[in-house]
Amino acid sequence: MAPLLGRKPYPLVKPLSEPPGPGEEVYTIEHTKEAFRNKEEYEARLRRYGERIWTCKSTGSSQLTHKEAWEEEQEVTELLQEEYPVWFEKPVLEIVHHNTVPLDKLVDQVWVEILTKYAVGEKCDLMVGNDKTLSVEVVKIHPLENPPEENAEKKMEGACDSPSSDKENASQENLKKEPQSKEEESRRESLSDRARRSPRKLPTTMKEEKKKWVMPKFLPHKYDVKLVNEDKVISDVPADNLFRTERPPNKEIMRYFIRHYALRLGSGESAPWVVEDELVKKFSLPSKFSDFLLDPHKFLAENPSTKRKSLSSPEGKPRKRLKNVETGTGGEGAKGDKKKNKDSQNIPLSPTIWSHMQVKKVNGSPLKMKNSGTSKKSDEENVLGTPKSSKKQGDKKSSDPKRRRKSGLNKTPNSQRLSKKEDKSLGGAKKPRMKQMTLLDLAKSPAAAGSPKKQRRSSTTGSAKLGKPFPPMALHLLRFYKENKGKEDKKTTLSSLLSKAAKALSPEDRSRLPEELKELVQKRWELLEQKRRWALMSEEEKQSVLKQKRQEVKQKLREKAKERREKEMQVRREMSRRYEDQELEGKNLPAFRLFDMPEGLPNTIFGDVAMVVEFLHCYSGLLMPDDQYPITSIALLEALAGEKAGFLYLNRVLVVLLQTLLQDELAEGYSELDMPLSEIPLTMHSVSELVRLCLRPSDAHEEESARGSDDWQSGADFDDMVSSEFLEKLETAEVFELDPQEKVSLLLALCHRILMTYSVEDHVEAVHQKSAEMWKERVATLKEANDRKRAEKQKRKEQMETKTDGDVLIKAEKKKESTVKKETPKVLPKEEPEPEDMISTVKSRRLMSIQAKKEKEEQERLNKVRMEKEAEEERIRRQKAATEKAFQDAVTKAKLVLRRTPLGTDRNHNRYWLFSDVVPGLYIEKGWVHESIDYSFTLPPEEEPVLTEEEEEEEEVKKEEETEDGEKEDEGSIISASNDISQQGAPSHESSIETTVPKQGQNLWFVCDTPKDFDELLESLHPQGVRESELKIRLQINYQEILHSIHLTKKGNPGLKTCDGHQELLKFLRSDIIEVASRLQKGGLGYLEDTSEFEEFEERVKTLEKLPEFGECVIALQESVIKKFLQGFMAPKQKKKKKTGGEESTTAEEVDDQKKLAEEARVATAVEKWKTAVREAQTFSRMHVLLGMLDACIKWDMSAENARCKVCRRKGEDDKLILCDECNKAFHLFCLRPALYRIPAGEWLCPACQPTIARRSSRGRNYKEDSEEEEDSEEEDEEESEEEDSEEEHRNTGHSLRSRKKVKTSSKSKMQKKPAKPASRSASKTDTNPSKTSPKSSAKPKSRAAPSSPVDIDELVRQSSKPPSRKKDVELQKCEEILQKIMKFRHSWPFREPVSAEEAEDYQDVITSPMDLTTMQGKFKSSEYHSASDFIEDMKLIFSNAEEYNQPSSNVLTCMSRTEEAFVELLQKSLPGVSYLRRRTRKRAATPSDNSDDDDDDEEEDERSKKQKNGKQGKKASSKRKVEHSRTEKYQTKQK
């Protein structure tokens, strides 16, 4: 198998006879695997293979390269292996081998052959009985007993014995045959069509329908078949009992098969097909060359007298007349006798013999007579008889093997009686011209049909009317052109004849030729004349002629281009004209499906739901930064429709919205019972009441007066969406109990309220700023690339100029050398051949090896350079792709935070919407115009100045340019999405074309959710409509996005989790009350000290069902809290304690009794209001909110669970921890100086709280100063006697109650609800039974546990220095591993080393406790960490310091957040039992606090507030920037 060169296969190079040596290089062609030792032969063969001169043998495709033709043949080979059954190979190749018919007829012939006969080896089904089949294989085909062709032949010969009725019989047979021919033709066409698309088994119903195509019946052969599963042979099985199991190949596969395995030798019509030798031997195909002696041309050449007699027969046998073209008349002659006499030489060529020679069946395959092709066809068309039936009959003969002999014998048309030799004799004018009879002559003399008639000369177009005869060359050209006009394989011969005629004929002879031929000959003569003149020209003349021709060609191209541009401009002008859509006629818009809403929801609210979901998606970076599950429209619709299924999902949406709203400055004035709403815990169970409190109109009015800005006036109208009646309804009902319409209006009101917050404004500004930065980077990158291209172009231009100058010099030198060489060869002496000895051979080999080595090194160097260049290009490409992706993302985000606008409107003013992926599909909105929308357009002016054509063209060109600029601006601008509704249509110059307005009606939403509907919509939109043209452009631009969105609609929506809202609220209210009580009891903050009392309280809460019962329980819980541990509006007003001792101190101002009474009354009133609200609560969410207020008013940071040693800052070892009875600070016994050996009896005061007189001056730490610094900002008042009494009473239970300080409400007082850990604290519960407590024991101070015996100080020190337990060792090892990983984390670079004074001058002033990762490593080495909690506290300190010192937009904070995320992830993997919770630093001005906390965060906050008051903000900001810059530089230097 190899591609053809011309018409012959091109042989491949034989493989190498010997394998190559170790150092020998072999050149191999990739696709053919041909190997060459000679590089020149290899390159020559490659060049040959690269030319487009090859033809694919299997498909016939020409003008291919060798590789393309080779690959096509490989594809055809694979196709035939898959599609062509092996049992059809032999019967088809037997027909093809040595056949001479064209390919199309050959394909028809073999295709019908395999359709009407089973092949040997074919597997089929044998029908046994009515319903049983057996799988069999054909092993033998029996020949037909009585072939129908022979019977038909005998019958037709018997019908045509009478010589007198020759003509009549022929005409009758033609009339009878014509309908049969048409029927056969239609049957054959349907058969070939059915073969391509029929299944493997035909349905039985096809036999009954006469009008439909039916598979041709199998010939009545009998077959011997062999059972597949058994070794048995069944003989003489009729064809009707066999059924094919595999469909035979179609005509196209058959065509590929014949081309692939056979080749036609020669270009003539009788050229035989020859099968490959291997297949001839494999299938033993018979040769048919002996039958080629029956060629009719050879027969006529051996019988010249027959030919002459047939032309001028005096016996009176009429001949067929040629058709007169000018008059349109024709004639025909009578037939001669049909008897065959092979011995006589004077018998004319009868139609029977002619048909035998024209269609001869040799070994089952017909042979086509070698003739001139078109001459026969033209003669057939010129005969007056039945040309259509003749044509169809001829086709039928060549394609239907069953009826070939029958039709060939007796149904030969009249057109076949005129031979080609006669035609040539008439055309050549060498014989005396015969008169041709017409039908009129025959009609006048019917009796003389057998006698010779007087012949008349017929006028033909090919003969000249002048007396001077044509030269032989002209006659030969005329005859050849007439016979072979339009034939592809005769073009070369015709071209050579034209050239000869152009040279031989004179101008007069050329002018006498027919018009078509005269034009061809004249062109060829002009071409030859031009070549002759070109050969006589000098070089200068040739250059001038070429230059002139080039100019002419350029001028023609310019003119054509100008005409094309004018036509395109005209088309563009016409297409750019816009008309009112409803005035245009076009396709109807497709009918879209109404969007399916869940049961109970009207279709009109879909727009509002889509707005809410789209708002949540567009602002997901602000509203849901860490949420992995987006809120979709389908899920939200289901949540709105169902109560049980929608409780969790709807409340989640409300929590997301309120989280942003309550944290904004806009909501600072939102409060309830003098407590800001932001301080109340926001959960799924309290959100319903918090929504009501946020949407109260009073808050909006207060905020309006507070802001005093005009933009609030426009937003205040959104409060009208939630009426007062609706808010009153929310007081008695939960959100999930509302109607769907009310739920949607609630969500809309929240969205509009959030849109007016400062957070949204900052978010939009940040997104746009990022987009602008990306745009600047993109512009800079493009500019840099353009500059680089410009520089490369300039450099290339300079190199070209240098190269041109060099080429001129080289040419001049070469010219000189050539002239010298021409002169010197005669003078040069004869060179003697150098002797070929061993030394010269070795030397030449060494030189060749050195040269090869150099070439190899050069090649390696070039490969290395090329690979480096490719790697650099790949890196640049990836970088560009990443930059482009980042830019597109930034632009997309910037567009998302703006107002979503529709894609456009159609002729009926329906709007088309494409949302994000959370609202999949393309939506159509009808009835969107209502009374509040002012839709208007400007009518065109009535009178316009009349413009000339040129002015009109200029005006249109300007308009087009303006339109294009406007479109570019609209696409490129981000803010263009926020245009007004009236500007959504066409550009401004086209807006005046509109003459219709949208009609008001019901707002309905339709959806386009299939690609077919979308494509139909695109086709139906009119491109010249003022609205639909813009809509079509937008749809085409977003085509892929719309298809993606349509595809998302097919995905199933997971159902929502069902949940009973009432039971959920009830369950969590019980758990929250129990949790608060548990924390009070474990932290020693309330009176629920007895375990049995707490368990009784817990059991009582679990049985509660009604809200009033829960209210009484919550009130009882509030009353059980020790008053000194209350804060906020529940905190009692305390007296400031007087300082004692000899030190000078400023005396606090005495509080006026009236002010004190007023303050007490205010507190009592606030608490009473809260209790009243608890008793009157009508919803569980309201009760959750009021319980959250109580939780926020408890000082949880004063709980005993949070006790931490003031000296070492560590928790743990509770039995060695003692609490001060004055300030509630904790100390380890062994951390005090001097250390304590045992828990002292009675009250114990820490060194900071001891009186000054009782203390001696110490060189150690100044605890008094520490305490004073902590208490500078506190306001203390003396407590009332009642409080002291309660304090005394509570002391009997084992507690030492001290005067606590009131802490102003802040975010630190709000604790997240979580189950309290059980703590074995004996300091707060030395004895749970008060009756058994002695006065001595009650006088003991607070301690973790009273030791049973006195403890020696050495023992305490030994215990303190004792190594930690094994579990703590494992935890610390894991902590050290975490630290090592954090050190290697790429974003931790700002925290690896301490901040020096050079980097930030004021860092030590702002940050009181600096910490870094290197210092922590040092702590691990020196074993300063005793537990994982110490390590976590230092990590918190690093992050808190970074938050406090750096500005919000700095890179350090970004690195901090990523480092903290990585740390939390590592901590959860390594230490899953250790929790991590860090309080975020509030960026608010700190207010004086009444209480000093143990935690370092409070001290740092006080320090920050003091520094801010001292006016160091500016210095701090500059230092932040400075440290950030210096740290970034350091990091970049290390990276490099």
UniProtKB/Swiss-Prot annotation:
UniProt cross-references to CDD domains, sorted A to Z: Bromo_WSTF_like, PHD_BAZ1B
Localisation: Nucleus
Domain (DDT) ranges: 603-667
Occurrences of domain Bromo (ranges): 1366-1470
ZnF segments: PHD-type: 1202-1252
UniProt entry keywords in alphabetical sequence: ATP-binding, Bromodomain, Coiled coil, DNA damage, Kinase, Metal-binding, Nucleotide-binding, Nucleus, Phosphoprotein, Transcription, Transcription regulation, Transferase, Tyrosine-protein kinase, Zinc, Zinc-finger
Keyword GTP-binding on entry: no
Region called Disordered, residue ranges: 144-207, 304-470, 557-579, 785-839, 940-973, 1256-1371, 1477-1536
Composition bias, Basic residues: 1297-1316, 1506-1524
UniProt-listed InterPro entries: BAZ1B, BAZ1B_Bromo, BAZ1B_PHD, Bromodomain, Bromodomain-like_sf, DDT_dom, WHIM1_dom, WHIM2_dom
Biased composition (Polar residues): 344-355
Subunit comment: Interacts with smarca5/snf2h; the interaction is direct and forms the WICH complex. Component of the B-WICH complex.
Domain notes: The bromo domain mediates the specific interaction with acetylated histones.
Protein's UniProt name: Tyrosine-protein kinase BAZ1B
Gene name, Swiss-Prot/TrEMBL: baz1b
